[in-house]
Amino acid sequence: MNYANFGLELFKSIADAAYEGKRVELAGKTLALKNRALDTERDYNYARLAFEKQRFETNADLRVNGDLYRMQALRAAGYRLNPFSNGHQIYADEAAAANLHSYYGFYKTD
């Protein structure tokens, strides 16, 4: 054993142990960051899958019930709509009032 190099070897072994500890610590932090990135990516993919599923179900629902929803929305907005009419959408009391006014207008004698 060479006592001249004993101090250097001791110092080198301490430095190597510190370096190895720091390397292990950094490797642990790197692994934690990679796990966090993978968790974030997984959460994003699940959210995207849920959105795509909702979009597909909404599109399928609109393909089946879209006209019904449109009619309900227009009626809720105050439009008087009859899906079976020919475009002359007038109610019976309005027709009676129109006939009455046309009668008075046509047979006006004053």
Curated annotation (Swiss-Prot):
Disulfide bonds: none annotated. One of its GO terms (cellular component) is viral capsid, decoration. Pfam families: Vesi_VP2. The keyword Nucleus does not apply. The keyword Ribonucleoprotein does not apply. Transmembrane segments: none annotated. Signal peptide: none annotated. It is found in: Virion; Host cytoplasm. InterPro entries: Vesivirus_VP2. Its main location: virion. Coiled coil: none annotated. Keywords: Capsid decoration protein, Capsid protein, Host cytoplasm, Virion. Belongs to the vesivirus VP2 protein family. Translated by a ribosomal termination-reinitiation process from the bicistronic mRNA coding for VP1 and VP2. Homooligomer. The portal-like structure consists in 12 copies of VP2. Interacts with capsid protein VP1. The N-terminus domain points away from the virion surface. Minor structural protein that forms a portal-like structure at a unique three-fold axis of symmetry, following binding to the host receptor. The channel formed by VP2 may allow the delivery of the viral genome through the host endosomal membrane. This is Minor capsid protein VP2.
